[in-house]
């Protein structure tokens, strides 16, 4: 179930709107539109697993859905909400640290967007938890009755959620591309600014050296050349520092990517463990029902086998 919340974190951090379109949507079976969303990044794969999990839940029986909507699940949702908000805060602080060299105006704008996304995320997660609790109450109130209407309502909500997730995921891809391009452009712009500032100085030094070489003695030429070499060495030093800073930023981006991959692997293992736990819940019930059915069939066969012998005894 952590996959669900991580997917919500990613989509809502991109600044997507949490509003659901009120107009009706055509009936579409789950799984028909998903192939058009493809991705190789860990968060994109997690988004696909999240929707597969929702589709799997919808196909379960009433009894299994009652188990999933128990009080324990609500408590787990609350714990996941707290953990998710901690991860969002840590990620926001880390991203703000990565944006340190950028202009103050850009940094303030990005920080404001992230804070707004964090607030929207908390509100949306609370809404999801309320919807789950409401659906659980409706199922309990209709115990022994048909739940087709509730299933239809759940399917409609999932279709709207899918449309919003697809839209937000595409928006997130664009935002990530823009942020990455902006970071690289900022680094290149810093190197270009250094070259622009040192270029006139170097050119001025060359002109002055040529003038001094024309009007002065060999000693003055040597001094001018030494000054030129000094300026050149300073320019190379500053250029090296700029390249080192760019390489450091790239290494930090690689560390962030490795951390995201590690967290994705952990969440995948937790999802597999949760699926195994669900399987262990229902396998004993299925085996018990099979045993009871086999016993019932055996009793019926035994009764049918003994019925012809009992009839003559009653006639005598």
Curated annotation (Swiss-Prot):
Post-translational modification: APOE exists as multiple glycosylated and sialylated glycoforms within cells and in plasma. The extent of glycosylation and sialylation are tissue and context specific. Glycated in plasma VLDL.
Main location: secreted
Entry superkingdom: Eukaryota
Modified residues (Methionine sulfoxide): 142
Transmembrane helix found in the keyword field: no
Region annotated LDL and other lipoprotein receptors binding, chain positions: 157-167
BP GO annotations: acylglycerol homeostasis; cholesterol efflux; cholesterol metabolic process; chylomicron remnant clearance; high-density lipoprotein particle assembly; intermediate-density lipoprotein particle clearance; lipoprotein biosynthetic process; melanosome organization
Binding site for heparin: 161-164, 228-235
Keyword annotations from UniProtKB, A to Z: Chylomicron, Endosome, Extracellular matrix, Glycoprotein, HDL, Heparin-binding, Lipid transport, Lipid-binding, Oxidation, Phosphoprotein, Repeat, Secreted, Signal, Transport, VLDL
Region (Specificity for association with VLDL): 277-289
Homooligomerization: annotated span: 265-316
Pfam families associated with the record: Apolipoprotein
InterPro entries, per database record: ApoA_E, Apolipoprotein_A1/A4/E
Signal peptide: 1-18
Region (8 X 22 AA approximate tandem repeats): 79-254
GO molecular function: cholesterol transfer activity; heparan sulfate proteoglycan binding; heparin binding; identical protein binding; low-density lipoprotein particle receptor binding; phosphatidylcholine-sterol O-acyltransferase activator activity; phospholipid binding
Sequence repeats: 79-100, 101-122, 123-144, 145-166, 167-188, 189-210, 211-232, 233-254
GO CC, alphabetical: chylomicron; extracellular exosome; extracellular matrix; extracellular space; high-density lipoprotein particle; intermediate-density lipoprotein particle; low-density lipoprotein particle; multivesicular body, internal vesicle
Subcellular location: Secreted; Secreted, Extracellular space; Secreted, Extracellular space, Extracellular matrix; Extracellular vesicle
Residue segments, region Lipid-binding and lipoprotein association: 209-289
Described function: APOE is an apolipoprotein, a protein associating with lipid particles, that mainly functions in lipoprotein-mediated lipid transport between organs via the plasma and interstitial fluids. APOE is a core component of plasma lipoproteins and is involved in their production, conversion and clearance. Apolipoproteins are amphipathic molecules that interact both with lipids of the lipoprotein particle core and the aqueous environment of the plasma.
Oligomeric and partner information: Homotetramer. May interact with ABCA1; functionally associated with ABCA1 in the biogenesis of HDLs. May interact with APP/A4 amyloid-beta peptide; the interaction is extremely stable in vitro but its physiological significance is unclear. May interact with MAPT. May interact with MAP2. In the cerebrospinal fluid, interacts with secreted SORL1. Interacts with PMEL; this allows the loading of PMEL luminal fragment on ILVs to induce fibril nucleation.
Protein family (similarity comment): Belongs to the apolipoprotein A1/A4/E family.
Record's protein name: Apolipoprotein E
Species in which this protein is naturally found: Orcinus orca (Killer whale)
């Amino acid at each position: 179930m952590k996959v669900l919340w991580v997917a919500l974190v990613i989509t809502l951090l991109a600044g997507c709107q949490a509003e659901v379109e009120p107009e009706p949507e055509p009936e579409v079976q789950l799984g028909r539109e998903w192939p058009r969303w493809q991705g190789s990044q860990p968060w994109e794969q997690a988004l696909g697993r999240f929707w597969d999990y929702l589709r799997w839940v919808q196909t379960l029986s009433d009894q299994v859905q009652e188990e999933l909507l128990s009080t324990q699940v609500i408590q787990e949702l609350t714990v996941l909400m707290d953990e998710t908000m901690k991860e969002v805060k840590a990620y926001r602080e880390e991203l703000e640290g990565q944006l340190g060299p950028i202009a103050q105006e850009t940094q303030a704008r990005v920080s404001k967007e992230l804070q707004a996304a964090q607030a929207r995320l908390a509100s949306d997660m609370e809404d999801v938890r309320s919807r789950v609790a409401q659906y659980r109450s409706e199922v309990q109130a209709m115990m022994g009755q048909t739940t087709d209407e509730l299933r239809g309502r759940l399917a409609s909500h999932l279709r709207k959620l899918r449309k919003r997730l697809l839209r937000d995921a595409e928006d997130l891809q664009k935002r990530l591309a823009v942020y990455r391009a902006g970071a690289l452009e900022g680094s290149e712009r810093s190197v270009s600014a250094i070259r622009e500032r040192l270029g006139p100085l170097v050119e001025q030094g060359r002109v002055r050296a040529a003038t001094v070489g024309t009007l002065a003695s060999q000693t003055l030429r040597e001094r001018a050349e030494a000054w030129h070499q000094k300026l050149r060495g300073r320019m190379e030093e500053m250029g090296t520092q700029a390249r080192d800073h760019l390489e450091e930023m790239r290494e930090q981006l690689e560390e962030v990517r490795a951390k995201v991959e590690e967290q994705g692997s952990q969440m995948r293992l937790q999802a597999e463990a949760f699926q195994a736990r669900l399987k262990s819940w229902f396998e004993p019930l299925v085996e018990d029902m099979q045993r009871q059915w086999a016993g019932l069939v055996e009793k019926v066969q035994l009764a049918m086998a003994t019925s012809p012998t009992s009839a003559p005894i009653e006639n005598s």
